[in-house]
Amino acid sequence: MNTGVSGADPYILRDGDKYYMYATTPGSVPGFKCHVSDDLQSWQDAGYCLTSEQSFGYKNFWAPEVVKYRGKYIMHYSAREQGSELLRIGVAIADTPEGPFRDAFSQPLLAVEGKSTIDAHCFRDDDGKNYLFFSMDCPTNIVNGVHTSQTMCIRLDDNLTKTIGEYKLISTPDCEWETSQNKEWQWNEGPFVLKHDGKYYLTYSANYYASRKYAVGFAVAERADGPYRKSEKNPILAYVENEMSGPGHNSFFTAKDGKLKCAFHIHADYNDPKGSRVVCVADAGFDKDGDLFVDYK
């Protein structure tokens, strides 16, 4: 289902009887908007929920995710930091899902020296441990001479506002469908983690976002922080001729009817894949073999 909402890297929070959508905005837009819906079909623009005035960043506001926690709403996101000009991960807090969100601190949550970090995803395990998954962005992350986006993981504290210890590598582009398009620039980005029947399912996107081959795969682990094994069924969400171009950077949520849903973006113009994208929602679930699927048809 095409929601008609322009944006990329979408995240949908269900809170009570309403759904709240957050997404990446164009580079020059200084903040994030929130869209609200009762039925996932009709969406109302609720205005800006976070702007550069409440953030460490000043542009390139990307991939916001919001969790409800201890009566507050906590947003993890990335933005461009003045001075270093690197993309950093921030954390902001609000009293309502529509904001206004304000940074918990005057500096980013995560700043890796000389590296841009993006696509923050907070995963709270049922044993009480919290994790932040994120992507080391390929313009500043060079591995064996290749610009490489890799998925990382680091522990979060009990308030979800500080990191604990060191980050570790979770996934890197190493499969044929992830690397055949471009040998000099490669991606594993946009991480999201689900837990099902005691196992951890990591979804991620590979290939260039402005390419029709941008697609979603998944990997499975026995522990939240891995090691993860990529599925042979990948990609599970990919280009469909004459229908859908560049589906990717997904997230999951449970709808009011109890069904698992997947939010993702596609290129707004099938015939002209580029940065302009629109948000879609599809059914998702697990098959008889325990493999994750997204039913986009």
What are these regions (language model features)?
Residues M1-K297:
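Carbohydrate-active catalytic/glycan-binding domains of CAZyme proteins
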